[in-house]
From Swiss-Prot:
Gene assigned in the entry: rpl32
Any one GO CC term of the record: large ribosomal subunit
Subcellular location(s) of the protein: Plastid, Chloroplast
Main location group: plastid
Protein name according to UniProt: Large ribosomal subunit protein bL32c
Keyword Plastid: yes
Family statement drawn from the similarity comment of this UniProt entry: Belongs to the bacterial ribosomal protein bL32 family.
Superkingdom per UniProt: Eukaryota
Swiss-Prot/TrEMBL GO biological process terms: translation
UniProt-recorded Gene Ontology molecular function terms: structural constituent of ribosome
UniProt KW keywords: Chloroplast, Plastid, Ribonucleoprotein, Ribosomal protein
């Protein structure tokens, strides 16, 4: 079974975590921006049901 030979340094751990957190933050900002545009009615590229009667 493969086992790492040495510990990962604290700085490397922090760098990797910072990269992951930055990607997650960017995705959250983009999702929030898209949700805002849909809710305010400014979006022109999303298609969604305008009324609640979808059964027809």
């Amino acid at each position: 079974m493969a086992v790492p030979k040495k510990r990962t340094s604290k700085s490397k751990k922090k760098t990797r975590k910072a990269v992951w957190t930055a990607k997650a933050d960017k995705a959250a900002v983009e999702a929030f921006s898209r949700a805002r545009s849909v809710l305010t009615g400014r979006s022109s590229s999303f298609y969604y049901a305008a009324n609640n009667d979808i059964s027809k």
